[in-house]
């Protein structure tokens, strides 16, 4: 949310493609938004992350933030998809719900496979009533490239079904199509909009329209299958959609039409800003 205060659209202090430079920039950045709270002594500051898979880096970034606020204590964890889920559940006002999180990244799931790129969670199925239960997570190491490619692997961590894959799935798949179409970060909405022109009389190139259509259709089918999977875990009729992928209002609408028997709610903050709400609520209510 920093860009709302420093007036730099899509601002990201760690946007450099070189990880070491990204890290240095984020550790040195002074947040405009935190200046608004300089005279407040918070009872607790809760910190969320998409998981950089480097605890030392995470800690130094946290230290930079803590130098800019006053608080009695602070809490940090890497439950990225759970924070998305809790945020969506809070705004839904449901008493119970199945939450589907679809994202371009998230917390790392450890693997016995030695890979250059860790497996980052891309999809989750959770259930919340008065407790949070995680039924399923799918994680991908696709960003590691061909040398990192492994066969799909399924197993359990406690009660959670885990899928590890080297395929591009969920928000990562959509991001890949966005880049293939020549768009940059945060321009997924441009691709979504183009898909509506697939069979129209337009000067937009057919190749571009085909990419946009593939992105919409393939990921829609993926989400339909994820909802079907969720229904096998619980007969709850309340479904919450969250995670950055569900900024895709066009496919959200199609999902609602596909399953008229279900009660849908789309998280109003499905992008990563919502995890700040989610972590605070999770830590406050988990007792």
Question: What do these predicted ranges mean?
Answer:
Residues 1-287:
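Short acidic/glycine-rich loops and adjacent helix/strand connectors
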């Amino acid at each position: 949310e920093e860009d709302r205060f420093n007036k730099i659209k899509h601002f990201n202090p760690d946007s450099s493609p070189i990880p070491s430079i990204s890290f240095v920039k984020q550790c040195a950045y002074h947040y405009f938004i935190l200046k608004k709270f300089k005279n407040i002594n918070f009872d607790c500051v809760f910190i969320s992350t998409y998981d950089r898979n480097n605890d030392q880096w995470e800690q130094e970034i946290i230290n930079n933030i803590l130098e800019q606020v006053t608080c009695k204590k602070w809490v940090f964890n890497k439950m990225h998809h759970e924070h998305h889920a809790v945020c969506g559940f809070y705004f839904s006002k449901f008493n119970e719900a199945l939450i589907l999180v679809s994202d371009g990244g998230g917390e790392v799931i450890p693997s016995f496979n030695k890979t250059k790129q860790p497996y980052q969670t891309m999809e989750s199925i959770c259930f919340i009533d008065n407790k949070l239960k995680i039924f399923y997570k799918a994680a991908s190491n696709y960003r590691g490239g061909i040398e990192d490619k492994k066969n799909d692997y399924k197993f359990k961590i406690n009660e959670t079904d885990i899928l590890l894959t080297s395929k591009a799935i969920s928000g990562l798949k959509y991001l890949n199509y966005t880049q293939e179409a020549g768009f940059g970060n945060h321009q997924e909405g441009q691709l979504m909009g183009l898909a509506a022109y697939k069979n129209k009389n337009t000067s937009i190139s057919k190749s571009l329209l085909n990419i946009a259509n593939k992105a919409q259709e393939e990921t829609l089918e993926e989400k339909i299958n994820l909802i079907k999977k969720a229904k096998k875990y619980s007969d709850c009729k309340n479904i919450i959609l969250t995670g950055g992928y569900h900024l895709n209002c066009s496919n959200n609408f199609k999902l609602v039409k596909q399953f008229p028997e279900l009660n849908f709610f789309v998280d109003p903050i499905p992008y990563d800003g919502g995890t700040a709400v989610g972590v605070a609520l999770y830590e406050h209510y988990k007792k």
